Every structure is written in structure tokens, then in C-alpha cells.
């Protein structure tokens, strides 16, 4: 068994969401080593499981909790301001909007499965169930052109869920002193879904 815990802080987020608590734990049990286990054709059986929470602070720029300004200069791009006979006076415009409520994107991961060897370890079977849920997805939506060319603030937009199974069946057999036959068959299934959004509508590109 193992367990770990940590508390991380990021200047990318607002004051109330600056810190996040994350942990992970795993358990394993070799059932075939127990005295009560009397199944002769099974050589090895291990049950295992794990669960953990991790955080993502990957936002750009990192100072999402404040609005930023940029200077405007030069008539060639129609970016300057004109006063009298000077057509290139420097001005300032909003470069990005702030989001004081921005917080950690959190990923919860659950795994459960077993490892099995049988028939004098000629055959092996590994099976896993996995489930991953990402909440507080970090996403930068599109802004209306009425707001100018400023960058939209990154937001926590919703939740996604991925779940499925992994199966691996193996065969290993020594057919002679210098020969060995091995083969593996793998099967995987996965289901991905968006389970929640802030307003039912997401505009813009992808996330991640």
C-alpha cells in the first residue's frame, strides 16, 4: 500500500482558489500467497486498486486574476491616437480581461484490476477498469467583437468523464531448449462524455 498528499499554490488563480489539495493512494493484495488459497491451476493472483487527484494550472498568461493593458502606437495599424498634428500619439487598450474566480482544473483517476497467471504460468490475464473525471476544465472562450481585440479570460467551464476496460491475454511456453513461443491479445474499450458545462454552450476551439 502507498499514499501521498500535497498542497499546491498557483498565482494563476484568484485569492479564494489559489491553493489545491491533491492526494493519491494504491492497494495491492497477492491472494495466491495466502494459506487459504487452494486453487492448484492458478499460479499467481493479485488484486489491486488505486485512486488519485491531480491538478492542472496550465493557463496562458499565468496572471489571469488581473486585467492587462497594452500600448497602441502607429497609424499604419490604426492603433494610435491623433492629437493636433501628431498622428502617432501613444495610447493604451485592454489586452486581456481578468477572472478572479478561476480555479484549479482537477482530475480524479480510479483504477481497479487483477493480474492472473495459470497453467504453470503458460497463460496470463490482466484486467483493468479505469475511470477518469476532469472537473473545472480550463478553457478560453471566444469574445464578442463588440469588446474589441482583447483576449478572453480563461474559465472553468465544466466536467468530462472517461471510463472503460483494458484486457490483456498472454501465452508463454518454452517449446525447446532455445525456443519460446509468446503471444498477446489486447482488448480496450473507452467511453468519453461531457457531463456538465457552465451554460450548455461552448464557443471557440478545443481544451487541454
Predicted regions and their residues:
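Extracellular/periplasmic, surface-exposed regions of secreted and cell-surface proteins
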Residues: 1-208
Amino acid at each position: 500500500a502507498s499514499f501521498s498528499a500535497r498542497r499546491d499554490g498557483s498565482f494563476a488563480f484568484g485569492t479564494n482558489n489559489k491553493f489545491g489539495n491533491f492526494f493519491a493512494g494504491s492497494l495491492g493484495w497477492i491472494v495466491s500467497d495466502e494459506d487459504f488459497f487452494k486453487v492448484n491451476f492458478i499460479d499467481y493472483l493479485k488484486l489491486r486498486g488505486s485512486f488519485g487527484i491531480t491538478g492542472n494550472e496550465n493557463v496562458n498568461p499565468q496572471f489571469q486574476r488581473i486585467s492587462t493593458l497594452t500600448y497602441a502606437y502607429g497609424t499604419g495599424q490604426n492603433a494610435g491616437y491623433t492629437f493636433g498634428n501628431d498622428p502617432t500619439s501613444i495610447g493604451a487598450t485592454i489586452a486581456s480581461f481578468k477572472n478572479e474566480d478561476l480555479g484549479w482544473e482537477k482530475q480524479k483517476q480510479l483504477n481497479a484490476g487483477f493480474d492472473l497467471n495459470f497453467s504453470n504460468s503458460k497463460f496470463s490475464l490482466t484486467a483493468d477498469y479505469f475511470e477518469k473525471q476532469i472537473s473545472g476544465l480550463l478553457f478560453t472562450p471566444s469574445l464578442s467583437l463588440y469588446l474589441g481585440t482583447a483576449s478572453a479570460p480563461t474559465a472553468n467551464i465544466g466536467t468530462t468523464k472517461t471510463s472503460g476496460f483494458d484486457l490483456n491475454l498472454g501465452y508463454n511456453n518454452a517449446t525447446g531448449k532455445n525456443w519460446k513461443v509468446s503471444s498477446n491479445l489486447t482488448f480496450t474499450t473507452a467511453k468519453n462524455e461531457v457531463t456538465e458545462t457552465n451554460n450548455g454552450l461552448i464557443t471557440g476551439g478545443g481544451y487541454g
